[in-house]
């Protein structure tokens, strides 16, 4: 499964299926065929629960799906913009439950600044879309607060 566009839907993943939230109570379900490629990033201010949440998401994916890849973006949206990522393994999420912060790093990228060009004059949103498409991601998990979710 591969999304041609970055859409404005919330995705719920579990038990070998993907549901797209299409309204307050309606979900559409797709069977997952082949490898599922999940991008993950942490954004905004650092907080103690980011590692635990990443671990929970990863553990759920690895335990409920046979063929999944998790791609971690370094330093939040900046990693998505400039393709600074690493292929995560299940062992990367071991031993982080009680560690504060985030193993991926974080940066603040306010939504109001996303439409401004970067230092080389490139559109930040287009850079993120290009990385998403080039890596053939099926979805992006964004962990953070209000600003992170607004940017997502």
Where are these regions (language model features)?
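Short glycine-rich or small-residue beta-strand-to-loop segments that form or flank ligand, phosphate
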Residues: 37-47, 103-105, 138-144
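N-terminal phosphate-binding or glycine-rich loops at protein starts, especially the Walker A/P-loop
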Residues: 34-84
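Glycine-rich nucleotide/cofactor/substrate-binding loop typically near the N-terminus or early
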Residues: 66-135
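Basic polycationic patches enriched in arginine
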Residues: 25-29
